[in-house]
A protein has these predicted regions:
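N-terminal Rossmann-fold cofactor-binding loop
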Residues: 16-20, 41
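Rossmann-fold cofactor-recognition segment
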Residues: 30-45
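Conserved Rossmann-fold cofactor-binding substructure of NAD(P)-dependent oxidoreductases
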Residues: 41-59
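A glycine-rich helix->loop->beta "capping" turn
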Residues: 53-65, 71-77
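Catalytic loop of short-chain dehydrogenase/reductase
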Residues: 68-76, 83-84, 106-158, 165-178
Length: 243
């Protein structure tokens, strides 16, 4: 819905799909999209492939990082790179895509209200030592997404970098019974990506339904932000470029 809103405002929109079959579904659902890039962002190779395709298309004004695995993951899944799939998709992918893509004017990272139950301790971020808990792993990843958004806002002060929670909405992840307003969740993504509203032209903030919200106190701790950037750089082999 965010894509449709942006297209309706005459913005040119590129979408992402995990594989070719899904890309065809996306093209049928949003035929006005400029392009669809394809790649499995659970792997470093797939993340790099997506970034390469995006950069080949030219400069983007805004990027919305909204790919994610939900809290219902029943077991730990290990990727080809030996990482937790939850961490790879929800945290490392937005980090590496941010580091590899030509910098846009705005970055939008999707978090969740569940981030407030998350932990920013990276000691066992891959869930190798702990018994798997999908809900906790998801909450942790969504807190790390806020840390990432705020770290980018601090490192790249000329860019607008924000995070948001769309709410518990009726998507494939949220399920059909989710009670929140899907339209408002999507509108907030589009608003942060493209609006000239002064309230949207800010950086290092967290939103819900276009309103600033409190975050987990750890999200503002610069040492935790830096630790996350260092950890992701170690895993991916690429540090976040200087501003």
């Amino acid at each position: 819905m965010a894509a449709e809103w942006l297209i309706g405002q005459r913005h040119r929109v590129t979408l992402h799909a995990r594989h070719a079959a899904r890309a065809e579904e996306v093209r049928r659902a949003v035929p006005e999209a400029e392009a669809v890039v394809i790649g499995d962002v659970s792997t470093l190779q797939g993340m790099r492939a997506v970034a390469e395709q995006v950069n080949a298309l030219g400069h983007f004004d805004a990027v919305i990082h909204n790919v994610g695995i939900g809290p219902g993951e029943p077991r730990r899944v290990e990727t080809a790179d030996g990482l937790s799939q939850m961490f790879a998709v929800n945290v490392l992918a937005p980090y590496l895509l941010t580091a590899l893509m030509a910098p846009p004017q705005r970055l939008v990272y999707l978090s969740s209200g569940m981030h407030r139950s998350g932990h920013a301790d990276l000691t066992d971020a891959q869930w190798r030592a702990r018994r798997w808990n999908g809900s906790q792993a998801y909450s942790d990843s969504k807190l790390l997404d806020v840390l990432l958004a705020f770290a980018v806002a601090r490192r790249w002060p000329r860019m607008l970098s924000n995070a948001l929670e769309p709410g518990w909405v009726a998507t494939r992840m949220g399920g059909p019974g989710a009670p929140d307003d899907l339209a408002l969740g999507s509108a907030t993504q589009a608003w942060l990506a493209a609006s000239d509203d002064p309230d949207a032209r800010v950086s290092g903030r967290y939103f819900y339904h276009q309103q600033p919200q409190r975050v987990h106190p750890d999200a503002h701790r610069e040492e935790l932000q830096d630790a996350l950037l260092d950890y992701c750089a170690q895993l991916s082999g690429l540090a976040l470029p200087a501003a």
